[in-house]
């Protein structure tokens, strides 16, 4: 988005709903992987980085869950098993629960 105008729809940022539409269309997969020494990592996949700022979403989740994490490629990795709480947080951010598995 450049200078207050959305590059996708051409509307001002205040009226743009591109991000809301993108949230409704995405199929998100939340899973827990085991790493070395029995550590668990919650991985959130299926997010489109062109429509949504993954860094901001990651920062929001890390602060709400009080954990560390990172953005790797098109996924967010959070330290620990936070699967249920991540689904609740995504729902509060406007993602449809039916599209989260």
Curated annotation (Swiss-Prot):
Transmembrane domains' residue ranges: none
InterPro entries membership: DENR/SUI1_TIF, SUI1, SUI1_arc, SUI1_arc_bac, SUI1_dom_sf
Keywords in alphabetical order: Protein biosynthesis, Translation regulation
Signal peptide annotation: none
Protein biosynthesis as UniProt keyword: yes
Gene3D superfamilies noted in UniProt: SUI1-like domain (3.30.780.10)
CDD domains: YciH_like
Gene Ontology biological process: formation of translation preinitiation complex; regulation of translation; translation reinitiation
Superkingdom of origin: Archaea
One MF term in the entry's GO annotations: mRNA binding
Pfam families, alphabetized: SUI1
Family: Belongs to the SUI1 family.
Protein name: Protein translation factor SUI1 homolog
